[in-house]
Amino acid sequence: MLCFFVLFFCCGTVLLEGADIDEIEHADKRRPIWNMGHMVNAVYQIDEFVDLGANAIETDVTFTKSANAEYTYHGVPCDCHRWCKKWEYVNDFLKALRRATTPGDAKYRSQLILVVFDLKTDYLTASTAYDAGKDFAKRLLQHYWNGGSNGGRAYIILSIPDLAHYKFINGFKEQLKTQGHEDLLAKVGYDFWGNEDLSSTRAAFQKAGVQDKEHIWQSDGITNCWLRTLKRVREAVANRDSSNGYINKVYYWTVDKYASVRDAINAGADGIMTNYPNVIVDVLKENDFKGKFRMATYNDNPWETFK
């Protein structure tokens, strides 16, 4: 009987502590920041970037001419001071990613809550982009979402380089509906990363059947080898905060220097894509930031605009 009460007390304490943590996070009025590890294409890099402090990662996906997702691979050129040729077969990477984001798995990393797939559709046509979207949906469903049963829990962003390839989104959504898993679209967001005019980007989303503020992240940026102003980031932030805007969240890439991270956060970015997640962690601990910003957790909805 004594053992029972001890066990009950200990388990109850753990449950209460978990509930307290959730309450604290919901009560925290600081802006959540997504610390996005850039170019995570080899399986071992998942742990590497999470260990550095990332709560999100970006992974490149290449396609064959037949519109089949093939490798997680960036290739040359890429960011300065990075090795451009790390890779995995897409299916293998998705399986490893599932383990890293499935509670209870030995490889589970609770901090990893968001994955941006940089879809290298450059060599596809507008019509084959649709086929590529269907193919990638099939692969995610099978290898990441485990057929819809106890799969990975991370939120997913489909990041497309060309507005003309909006049909990738159409194909992706229709494939999940065809296979009876339209519910998984609740975990999927969208982005065009080619730095196009915001009004043209909005029109492309509408063609893809994505309504204003329907899981839309708007990116802006350039390789870390070059400098880029925050002008378009501020335009995107203004759109996000407008009552008639189309954007939910804004992220800036690729940002490695402390001063640039500070500037991006002060400009209103929700996410910072970086080769050095520890830099973002350090900045968020600084006196000027720790009272107003924090690392995003799984309790932060990435499709809701922070107010």
Swiss-Prot record:
It is an enzyme of class 4 (lyase). Its EC number is 4.6.1.-. GO terms for biological process: killing of cells of another organism; lipid catabolic process. It catalyses: an N-(acyl)-sphingosylphosphocholine = an N-(acyl)-sphingosyl-1,3-cyclic phosphate + choline; an N-(acyl)-sphingosylphosphoethanolamine = an N-(acyl)-sphingosyl-1,3-cyclic phosphate + ethanolamine; a 1-acyl-sn-glycero-3-phosphocholine = a 1-acyl-sn-glycero-2,3-cyclic phosphate + choline; a 1-acyl-sn-glycero-3-phosphoethanolamine = a 1-acyl-sn-glycero-2,3-cyclic phosphate + ethanolamine. One of its GO terms (cellular component) is extracellular region. Keywords: Cytolysis, Dermonecrotic toxin, Disulfide bond, Hemolysis, Lipid degradation, Lipid metabolism, Lyase, Magnesium, Metal-binding, Secreted, Signal, Toxin, Zymogen. Disulfide bonds join C78-C84, C80-C225. Mg(2+) binds at E58, D60, D118. Coiled coil: none annotated. SUPFAM superfamilies: PLC-like phosphodiesterases (SSF51695). Expressed by the venom gland. The active site is at H38, H74 (nucleophile). Dermonecrotic toxins cleave the phosphodiester linkage between the phosphate and headgroup of certain phospholipids (sphingolipid and lysolipid substrates), forming an alcohol (often choline) and a cyclic phosphate. This toxin acts on sphingomyelin (SM) with high activity. It may also act on ceramide phosphoethanolamine (CPE), lysophosphatidylcholine (LPC) and lysophosphatidylethanolamine (LPE), but not on lysophosphatidylserine (LPS), and lysophosphatidylglycerol (LPG). It acts by transphosphatidylation, releasing exclusively cyclic phosphate products as second products. Belongs to the arthropod phospholipase D family. Class II subfamily. Class IIa sub-subfamily. This is Dermonecrotic toxin LiSicTox-alphaV1.
